[in-house]
Amino acid sequence: ETNKRKIHRVFEYEENVKMLSNYIKTKIPTISNGICHGTRRGKEQDWFSKYLNCDIFGTEISETATKFPKTIQWDFHDIKDEWINNFDFIYSNSLDHSYDIPYCLSQWSKCLKNNGMLIICGTTAHHPLASKLTADIGGYTKKSIKETITNIPQMNVIDTINPKKKKLIYLSWYYVIGQKYI
């Protein structure tokens, strides 16, 4: 399984999570929780917890999830009843692992509180053409993610952010930020 082969790797950078955390604080004054989907070994939720000083957990579909704190084994297409309207933000750099991206984002939006934020990381590696060369199921572009979020009821795209740090092999690296309104 690809996840087990890459278990010691972390896709995201701590500096970028710090930047995103500062951004979240400007939009949501009181942050109590969040969820990171597809976290492999859970570094993203550790960093968000550190910079936002709140409870963050992650999901990972692989059975390796149980080896890491604050990570549950879970298919991120599914949501629990107690997650509905419960989270201040949801972050993922693993959306290319979705078998149905519009459905997945729609499910995640149900879990956001009013004004909650959906943060999707994208790179050239997430592009549909690149995903055909990897083990990833799907792919997306900045434009397609923005359109998909905009088409979800009660969701708007509020920003696109370029990170301070990125891997040199990727020609582009960005975050699309959606926000729920009721």
Regions flagged by a language model, labelled:
Residues E1-P29:
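Class I SAM-dependent methyltransferase Rossmann-like catalytic core
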Residues N33-I79:
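Class I SAM-dependent methyltransferase SAM/SAH-binding core
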Residues P102-M117:
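A short glycine-rich, Lys/Arg-flanked "PGG" loop and its adjoining helix->strand segment in the class I
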Residues A125, A130-I158:
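Conserved Class I S-adenosyl-L-methionine
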Residues N151-I182:
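Core SAM-dependent methyltransferase catalytic element
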